[in-house]
């Protein structure tokens, strides 16, 4: 049965990197992949067309699709809009609407890019971490929240950090099941010494861990985890954490690899439906200049094939094509170094197609 993908170009470099990735998708379809796709706007593009960053047309298409592929959202020209209308709110809205509670962010250092990391190569060579971040709870979505005026006239900002047992259980299963396909280690990260939210988190992870006796479970405070990611990152396999801690740690881990332009991400629901996007932003400073690195988006397509279409063979085919391109010495500006060949966004896309 034909699977359907909703493709959201987004803002900034989004249309360029998505265009190169769709060329890869088209070639896979020509080779026999039974998939159809349709475009819809999200973020600033959607606001310009519909007056809302996540309009009804996009909602309906994404709800019906088996998976969603996104470029990037956000641009300075929208910074003065009311908060609910800003492009980034469209991304939050689609995660909530599709109940995408599990964010998977790999941090992989390809051997060809070992010199791109700011850390010594012996510390990061062979790095392969997966950060599993809970995406729909925690302080980003907790109520009540707001800014209020106190009796003394001073203003106070407040937010609510909270997690339910069921929210923790389902992300724990994702973390342990991911670890089973890797090196069978989960490190649960929180701040259980001062936060009741993560005290419960730790308790539930211990409970769920008993269902996965082949996976080693450890716990770490978030401040120590941030330090250990820089000191000895290869000790980690799967890091499982809440929304706000995961937001910070996944960005930190991404820079161990030298360029966030290489890193894909997946956000999944309980049935494997997912939103796939590069970890980087919309980079409006280079938008429209054919300079962007499309490889994170291409690798996001590989994750889509793996997690939503259960097509491991084609996922590996795409990942191998990316590695071959790097072995050929081709580099966009963000990963360029002396002795390699600087190429444009579309030239990188050409190279991936040629090796696919």
Swiss-Prot record:
One of its GO terms (biological process) is L-leucine biosynthetic process. GO terms for cellular component: cytosol. Binds 1 Mg(2+) or Mn(2+) ion per subunit. It is found in: Cytoplasm. InterPro entries: IsoCit/isopropylmalate_DH_CS, IsoPropMal-DH-like_dom, Isopropylmalate_DH. This is 3-isopropylmalate dehydrogenase. NAD(+) binds at residues 281-293. Its main location: cytoplasm. GO terms for molecular function: 3-isopropylmalate dehydrogenase activity; magnesium ion binding; NAD binding. Keywords: Amino-acid biosynthesis, Branched-chain amino acid biosynthesis, Cytoplasm, Leucine biosynthesis, Magnesium, Manganese, Metal-binding, NAD, Oxidoreductase. Its cofactor is Mg(2+); Mn(2+). Pathway: Amino-acid biosynthesis; L-leucine biosynthesis; L-leucine from 3-methyl-2-oxobutanoate: step 3/4. Mg(2+) binds at residues 223, 247, 251. The keyword Translocase does not apply. The record marks 140, 191 as: Important for catalysis. It comes from the Bacteria. Belongs to the isocitrate and isopropylmalate dehydrogenases family. LeuB type 1 subfamily. Transmembrane segments: none annotated. The keyword Metal-binding applies. Homodimer. Catalyzes the oxidation of 3-carboxy-2-hydroxy-4-methylpentanoate (3-isopropylmalate) to 3-carboxy-4-methyl-2-oxopentanoate. The product decarboxylates to 4-methyl-2 oxopentanoate. It catalyses: (2R,3S)-3-isopropylmalate + NAD(+) = 4-methyl-2-oxopentanoate + CO2 + NADH. Its EC number is 1.1.1.85. Substrate binds at residues 95, 105, 133, 223.
